[in-house]
Amino acid sequence: MRVDALTSTLEQRVLLNDLDLNLHMNNGRFLTVCDLSRVDLFIRTGLLALMLKQKWAPIIVRHTMDYKKPLRPFQKYTVSMSITRWDEKYFYATHQFLSRGKVVAEGESTAVLLGREGVVPPAKVIEAVTARQNGTAVERR
């Protein structure tokens, strides 16, 4: 799989429904935006279609965020998410929020894909996505 395919970058703006009582972006909204970046990656790599076909469900098992600066109403920001590595069970990703050239938040997440038989090994997922990108049929398992 191409390395650039493992990164999602989205440009966003803080909306009024993103705010907390302190009038900056709510910490929970940062996590929701991380979810949006994952969905973007799933769509662009073809993984979403495979997940639907194979009945695989993405599960975040751990997510940490460090908040460095607040994001104010209507402020523009960019969120980048990269899958940095995987092992026999988990995918590991980093998330970075930038505004005006400065890091405002960053975090890491650990995820699995669950199938009918339990956790789908990342190697199997990568193989299936690569085959799909190359136009090769992948059998349903």
Can you say where each PLM-predicted feature lies in the sequence?
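Hot-dog-fold acyl-thioester-processing enzymes
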Residues: M1-I60, L114-R141
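Hydrophobic beta-strand-centered segment that forms part of the acyl-chain substrate-binding groove
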Residues: L41-R85, E106, V112
